[in-house]
């Protein structure tokens, strides 16, 4: 994905039709510019956390590792941290804590390559926050 593609995907978030469910004023959303790929082509996944409510906060310093991501029901990243705030990065965090409304694009992108045709499902879980289900069609 080029920088222009990344920028376009970031802009696309505002109008992305399928965002994650809001839980306690926050939500997770994943998006891509390539939902249809050929076998062995890559698709990159952009991760966005959003605080809708002023009482909800985001930890915007990044890039942050993506934890708790599943492809076709299998965990493919490091597991999520179980204790405390699901969006708080593991380890010592000494960055901005931003109240809502705010959007955090400061997560690393995931890159996937699928060999066989079909539909692949990607979901990002952090605590009780669950993203939208992103479908990647391999044709």
Regions of interest found by a model, annotated:
Residues 1-10, 19-111, 117-119, 124-126, ...:
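Contiguous segments within soluble domain cores/interaction surfaces
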Residues 130-139:
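Extended, polar beta-sheet/loop recognition surfaces of beta-rich domains
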């Amino acid at each position: 994905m080029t920088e222009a593609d990344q920028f376009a995907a970031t802009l696309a978030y505002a109008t992305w039709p399928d965002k994650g469910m809001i839980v306690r004023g926050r939500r997770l959303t994943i998006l891509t510019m390539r939902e249809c790929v050929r076998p062995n082509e890559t698709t990159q996944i952009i991760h966005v956390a959003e605080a809708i409510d002023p009482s909800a906060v985001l930890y915007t310093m990044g890039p942050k590792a993506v934890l708790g991501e599943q492809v076709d029901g299998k965990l493919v990243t490091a597991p999520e941290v179980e204790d405390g705030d699901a969006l708080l990065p593991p380890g010592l965090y000494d960055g901005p804590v931003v109240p809502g409304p705010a959007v955090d694009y400061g997560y690393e992108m995931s890159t996937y390559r699928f060999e066989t045709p079909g539909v692949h499902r990607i979901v990002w879980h952090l605590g009780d926050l669950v993203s939208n289900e992103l479908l990647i069609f391999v044709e």
